[in-house]
Amino acid sequence: MSLTYMNMLMAFTTSLLGLLMYRSHMMSSLLCLEGMMLSLFVMVTITILNMKFTLASMMPIILLVFAACEAALGLSLLVMVSTIYGMDYVQNLNLLKC
């Protein structure tokens, strides 16, 4: 396993641990999700380039599209929650009332 794969795997696990540990604020959860998507994008791109999969060359672009949709939806939810409740604490929100 090369050094780049190890770094991206470590970045993914760090983002996953950050998502599990700092889930009290919605903004920190969104940042950790973006870090996970970025490391997945780099790992998929490097794997496709190393294995010379010509048919799977659209996979990183599709992953970026889903990451952009996730970021837009997350930011719109953050704006909605912060304007309604005045805070972005996830633990204080009751999803049945939203």
Curated annotation (Swiss-Prot):
Subcellular compartments: Mitochondrion inner membrane
A GO term, aspect molecular function: NADH dehydrogenase (ubiquinone) activity
InterPro entries in UniProt: NADH_UbQ_OxRdtase_chain4L/K, NUOK/Mnh_C1-like
Keyword rRNA-binding on entry: no
A GO biological-process term: ATP synthesis coupled electron transport
Catalytic activity: a ubiquinone + NADH + 5 H(+)(in) = a ubiquinol + NAD(+) + 4 H(+)(out)
CC terms in the record's Gene Ontology section: mitochondrial inner membrane; respiratory chain complex I
Topology within the bilayer: Multi-pass membrane protein
Gene3D superfamilies noted in UniProt: 1.10.287.3510
EC number: 7.1.1.2
Record has Membrane as a keyword: yes
Keywords for the protein's UniProt record, in alphabetical order: Electron transport, Membrane, Mitochondrion, Mitochondrion inner membrane, NAD, Respiratory chain, Translocase, Transmembrane, Transmembrane helix, Transport, Ubiquinone
Pfam families, per the entry: Oxidored_q2 (PF00420)
Superkingdom, taxonomy of origin: Eukaryota
Family: Belongs to the complex I subunit 4L family.
Complexes and interactors: Core subunit of respiratory chain NADH dehydrogenase (Complex I) which is composed of 45 different subunits.
Protein name in the entry: NADH-ubiquinone oxidoreductase chain 4L
Organism, scientific name: Ectophylla alba
